[in-house]
Amino acid sequence: VRIAEETKEVDALIFVGLPLEYNGKLYNVAAGLNHGEILGFVPKTWLPNYNEFYEARYFTSGEHVDGTVHIDREAYKERYDSDFDDVEFDIEMTSFDGFEELEEIDDEDFGGENFDDEDLFDDDEMDDELYEEDIWISPNTIFTCEDMPKLQIAAEICEDLWVPNPPSVAHAFHGANLIVNLSASDEVVGKDSYRKSLVSAQSARLLCGYIYATAGEGESTQDVVYGGHNLIAENGSVLAESKRFANGVIYADLDIHRLDNERRRMTTCQFAPDLAPEGKDISYNEAPFTLENTETVLTRKFDSRPFVPGIKEERERRCDEILNIQAMGLKKRLAHIHCQNAVIGLSGGLDSTLALLVTVRAFDMLGMDRS
């Protein structure tokens, strides 16, 4: 609640990780915030309980959670203390089967005798309609931008990405084209390369943007070390990557319209709200948010020759691949019709030169005399 209040003037969709008690269970959740509003809580689905991970000791999987959390901001305002660790507020749990439970918290000791909430809250600045909120808690939530209808965002948490069937797969089938991952992935020798390839591959499989933010070096403990390895990927390409073991910010320009076009072009898997992977009859909640649609300086660089690699070794490998693909096709055709020679009309241009090179390679593959 406090973070939402502090960021209500920030024009951004912000995700914050936190533990949340719901119906007597503790969940590891990502909260989506926008202009002072808490849009929804997304609980973690897959809980690691191997090697250095012990999440199942404390948390419950949120795979089947689908309900609302009622937050009374007026109660929070009255009980607010300058020490954030002591902040508590009334939470009413409501699920769709009609279960309701209201937990009353004794606030006798909140604030102390010198506590003055007027110094901390301004009634004129705090919207009356936000005093009480019913907020979704469900892994099946898509955050939709009212100002950019094609931008649809979903969240998953750390281990959710590392399993064979990540929640982001269903998110993508229901329209999400940008996935955010709030992670606490510790550092082990070689793990950064695997992590990077995982993020890149997932963005390619789902034809989406993928933002991966992990715990920083200041959160390391005696048991694990965190390197703050943050990544931004789009359709298989890593657009930004942070330096490990250093705090900082990364950013990148994502081409949402390009992703949308790629999804229309790839008809094998239809990305639409009414479709999902086989056996996944899932209903999704929409959490609308707003962003000011303004022009900014483009930081992303686009190559004027996108099909010609700038690195010499990669360029030579690409040219050799082109020759092999064409020569293999010609080889198959020559063998099929039992042809022992070829006639090429040479104009001296690039096309006829390429035709000659392809023919020579095809003859070599067949073991035929070039002459």
Language model segments and positions:
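Enzyme catalytic cores with a strong preference for nitrogen-chemistry domains
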Residues: V1-E103, D117, D122-G345, A355-R370
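Residue-identity detector for glycine
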Residues: G98, G111-G112
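Conserved G/P- and acidic residue-centered "switch" motifs that form tight phosphate/ATP-binding loops
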Residues: G349
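Catalytic nucleophile loop
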Residues: S352
